[in-house]
Amino acid sequence: MLEQMLNQKVAGLVQLRLTLADKLKDTITHLNTLQSRVLDDELIRWKREQQLQGNGSQFNSNLDSIQEWCESLAEIIWLNRQQIKEAERLKQKVGLEPPGVADILPNLNNQITQLLSSLVTSTFIIEKQPPQVMKTNTRFTSTVRLLVGGKLNVHMTPPQVKVTIISEAQANALLKNDKMAKGEASGDILNNTGTMEYHQATRQLSVSFRNMQLKKIKRAEKKGTESVMDEKFSLLFQSQFSVGGGELVFQVWTLSLPVVVIVHGNQEPHAWATVTWDNAFAEPGRIPFAVPDKVAWLQVADALNMKFKAATGRLLTEENLRFLAEKAFRGGGQQQVGDYSTMMLSWSQFCKEPLPERNFTFWEWFYAVMKLTREHLRGPWIDGAIMGFIRKKQAEELLSTCANGVFLLRFSDSELGGVTIAWVGEQAEVFMLQPFTSKDFAIRSLADRISDLQHLVSLFPDVPKEQAFGKYYTPYTENQPTTSNGYVKPLLVTHVPGWGGPAGSLGGGSYPSTPQNMYQPQSPDPSVTRDTPSVASAVSDSVSSLTTVMEL
């Protein structure tokens, strides 16, 4: 009877252990699903939005929420791992080997440990990306964070993080083999090691590299039409730490977004083309750093719109985007509305092939316009005072029916980063002023130049120029004090020969004490109708002369 009772208890225990193993198995299945949702959906989405931020997209980071989910997962996984290990220990202690149980527990232990490993390695992330266009010998910053560091007590022995720069081919090899040759790198980075610190208030384990500097870069061999600005690198962040009193050791690494390395400022526009194309069209889970060679115009338009809005403060209109499509596809105005939407734009058309009869590409033209607007025209652009994206012929057609003195502003087709003023003269004739560039606006702003030119009366269609640009005029005081060194400061005023004297010479304007008719030929200078640079622009302020006014 005693033996029978013992056998019944043993059978009951075996059944309970089988039930426990089944429940643990179900728990791991649920954890797997949940972890996949957090890592493969939420964290991947966060990374994608972080990449689009590089193109100017608004980034509402929910990383703190993702950390909370990851910490909860880490806690549940760790507790279940302890349960499995305890069940294994009891099995060995009792010495019972019921059929079917002996193999389940080690297998479950492997599964739960793999889940933990995946969670830890996936949550070692770059919170603040390094600059994607990186100039050698220029300081830059970056921050990495371990989302589950606090929960797993990793900070008890703070891990070291090392940063190296690797090529596209090396990044490929790393993802395939999960390892790289020791010490292999594509350049030298100063101040490239740091210790992760735990911040009690935020419960974040992170390290900020504030003073890194790329000293040297090794380039790959170029093929065909490739340039150094097409070549992509990545910063590799590596660390190692243990959890559970050294029971588990994790080697973690993560790659930054693609980086283009330049040595000179004139390489910046093309480098940004590479980065913009990659950020916009990179697909999840791609081979580093593969991007499509052709993309639908609608996607390109979205990327350009996002970029322009971030730089200048205002989105492009449908008309603006149609103009850009026409320019990118070298359409010359023949295409009808909407024809471009399904067309595919190639990387070569985007930033390799020069525009017709020009020595610059579509991207170089767009980038120069965006830079000019950001640095010198932001206010009027946001107000809608700059039409900008309109062809010379269209501008002439619009103005041909307007009154004398009506003007509009358009970006030059022929000069990089140039904006020209088109206006109506006598007998409805339309004139174009030679384009102003950043160099001109560094001397005198657009609004002040428009104020100087008395023959400009109303912004198209009929907005008085004071209403459109008045708030951007530089305040003027008649009695200018002498500077600290005793000199009287001169004032530079824009004047178009043949179109009236400088402001004030007609009895009004912003600068009433400007001398009368210092330089006034009898007829308009024929070069004002051109929209091309001239030799004169190298020695004078565009085609307009600058009248120096001494305020005495």
Model-predicted segments: where are they?
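Eukaryotic phosphotyrosine signaling hubs
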Residues: 1-107, 111-114, 129, 153, ...
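Contiguous beta-strand segments within globular domains
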Residues: 121-123, 127-167, 234
